[in-house]
């Protein structure tokens, strides 16, 4: 927060352009804490992870959280993969710091299709593109990239940090979701996910 408050300029006049930023999610986590009176990690655990039986998912808090069966990151160097793992404290909660599995991510995905956590009318707002003051759409909703692939609507997001690259794609009209989690810095999970979509769709 101190880093954000120290800024005295913006890249452009707000509303005139779109630029992805993790800072907004870090700020949102602070808003959740202020309104709920809980830590952000505690709020996620109580309101999302527990209700959905995401028992292997943790929003990491240094000195508090335990991460079982954790995968470690690697980078290809000098002809071999070598450990190159992020620090457990390198990700700020809100825009990162969550450890999960494909099984738990599937539970989260199912909850989105069934609107288990919030009503459909609230959930659907996340899948509406932002609009600039010019009237142009940004192609980004509330935490989702909105585009088309193979002539189908797609909502997705990528994520990466030292030693890890991941992608989560959803094709709501087809009821198809693809989650690719990797523990290496090289390669393209998005290409893998696109290939899976091509095979299925």
Predicted features, each with a name:
Residues 65-77:
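Mobile, glycine-enriched helix-loop/loop "lid" segments at the mouths of ligand-binding/catalytic clefts
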Residues 59-61, 76-77, 133-136:
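Short alpha-helix boundary/capping motifs
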Residues 3-5, 74, 126:
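A generic structural signal for nonpolar/aromatic side chains embedded in well-ordered alpha-helices
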């Amino acid at each position: 927060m101190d880093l954000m408050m120290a800024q005295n300029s913006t890249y452009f006049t707000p509303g005139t352009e779109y630029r992805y930023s993790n800072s907004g999610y870090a700020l949102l986590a602070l808003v959740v804490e202020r309104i709920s009176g809980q830590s952000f990690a505690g709020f996620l655990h109580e309101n999302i992870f527990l209700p959905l039986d995401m028992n292997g998912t943790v929003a990491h808090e240094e000195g508090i959280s335990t991460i079982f069966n954790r995968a470690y990151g690697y980078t290809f160097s000098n002809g071999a993969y070598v450990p190159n793992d992020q620090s457990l404290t390198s990700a700020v909660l809100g825009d990162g710091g969550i450890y999960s599995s494909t099984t738990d991510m599937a539970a989260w995905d199912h909850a989105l299709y069934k609107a288990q956590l919030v009503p459909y009318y609230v959930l659907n707002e996340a899948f509406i593109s932002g609009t600039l003051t010019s009237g142009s759409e940004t192609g980004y909703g509330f935490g989702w990239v909105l585009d088309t692939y193979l002539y189908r609507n797609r909502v997705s997001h990528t994520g990466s940090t030292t030693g890890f690259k991941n992608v989560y794609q959803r094709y709501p009209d087809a009821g198809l979701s693809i989650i690719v989690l990797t523990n290496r810095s090289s390669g393209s999970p998005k290409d893998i996910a696109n290939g899976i979509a091509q095979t299925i769709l």
